[in-house]
Amino acid sequence: MGVAVGDALGMPTEGYTAREISSKFGMVREMMPAPEGHFHSGLTAGQFTDDTEETLLLAESLIDASGFSPDGFAEKLTSWGATWTLDERLNRGVGFATRSAVESMIRGKPWQQSGLNIPTCGAAMRAAPIGLLYHTNLNIVKSYADLQSLPTHTSAAARAGAVAVAVGVALCLTGFSKEMILRNAASQASRLDEYFAERLLWVGELLDLKPEDALGVIRNSPLAAETVPAAFYCFMRFEPEEALVMAASSGGDTDSIASIAGSLFGAAKGSRWIPESWLAVLEGRERIESAALCLSELSSSICR
């Protein structure tokens, strides 16, 4: 649920600078529709983007296969991509790497060859279900978080971002402190990309700065080495609701930053912290709750 509310909260501000958001919206404390002329124009308050859609596709592939199946996940992505030919709006603002990879799979290219060497956050933003399902075994979390990246993203940074998010979610579920979660997520990610891991670990040194200063130096583009550290900063620095408000108001890839932060808080604290005003308008709530429940039940059987 944290992924979806973060995504929907950050949806209308994606692509704006922090200054533009302040001028157009103020602090983003409630769900809002995408502005006219925005690339999410047409989405209403509470609707989510590709971040949540891909997270759900991964979660539902895990449920269908009673575990991770790269073939099954690739099939989910391909079926989703096929809907774009009927209605372009159904891609929900999908990123370039994922769009190109999915279109390649639709044309028959196997998932082992479809991914692009682009260091963006598309694999990280959807990785939370791996951490949820396999949270008692970090080796499996790391392996499968990396593997689920490959149909769309093959760069070291993109894969490291996915590992960091999935490991973070897993450790949130097992009750680690925020400091230990950050260190372990960076350590696991370092085996794929040292630079990414250094930037993630650096977040711990920025917690005494003003939030706008810290997020300004972390930056907030769709690069995994910016989006993922920004999300972890919000997780480390704030309580859940305020973390998502800050993520949605900070500029850049706001929906991904807020959704990743939401995934960490969802694992750590469940959904009790989510304002009812957010949940009341959230798209697909029944589908999201069903997937979360099924994953939790499946995890209980796998992790015994």
Language-model features and meaning:
Residues 1-304:
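Structured, active/binding-site neighborhoods that engage oxygen-rich ligands
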